[in-house]
């Protein structure tokens, strides 16, 4: 039942998942009493039920007035976080929403979705790279955005270990280009999407994002634009995250690969991530790094076993689990500060 605290719900889920039975969640008592739903409205266990904590809920209606009638630019707007930002912002009546992405297919998908769901929205989709300063300046000259949410980045830890130059060029110089242009064009507020891997970084991707944070903090001291950063943990269900990988491996009959039996990570859902970004945009005074309280870290091995059981299999029997060792630059545990 949703009325259980996150830890209690997690304990019951752990017990039930070992029975081999299908697990469903009943509506909350308050929903039944208010007539919002009926007892027949059961739902399957969802990704956020695996977090072991209550979901973070934010009344965005109270804080998103700063978006109303503003021109908003989202870099990397076709990605997991960027596209959800587009969806949320579109609901709060911006004057214009500008999506900037190098991947045309992703940009096209979110463009079609927003035109279908928000036909009244003034929407522009622009293809290009944050590494191209001329293109960035041309974009800001054309649209004169009030707010920029900078989500464009390379984020895959192992791939960036093999291509460090690309991580620096795209993440660091891309952020520098966007920040310099934002300051030159009088943008009111600039929000950088960062990561918990920027804390005492041990890999190229984390180090590049820490440099991005330093860039925006430096720019905040030197310009009238308010520059802030938002630091995430791992995002459940995002492109390239561990859960879709596990689901594909389970669907293929295994094995499920985990780097280390004791490795832990902080997790959040995409809506939680976006609510933090939008809150940061509201509360920003300039120079801050915002961090979401994500509760206790989750053991990846436990998550893999739960997903196997929720798929109707027994871990280690029907679906083997293989531990293939920490990858270069990978930590056993992450921090937030």
Question: What annotation goes with each model-predicted range?
Answer:
Residues 35, 150, 154-213, 218-220:
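Conserved Rossmann-fold NAD(P)-dependent oxidoreductase catalytic core, especially the SDR/UDP-sugar
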Residues 126-147, 329:
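Conserved Rossmann-fold cofactor-binding substructure of NAD(P)-dependent oxidoreductases
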Residues 160, 245-268, 272-300, 323:
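A conserved pocket-lining segment of Rossmann-fold NAD(P)-dependent short-chain dehydrogenase/reductase
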Residues 283-337:
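Mid/C-terminal beta-alpha module of Rossmann-like enzyme folds, strongest
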Residues 71-92:
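N-terminal Rossmann NAD(P)H-binding glycine-rich loop of SDR-like oxidoreductase domains
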Residues 1-34, 102-111, 116, 123-124, ...:
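A solvent-exposed beta-alpha-beta segment
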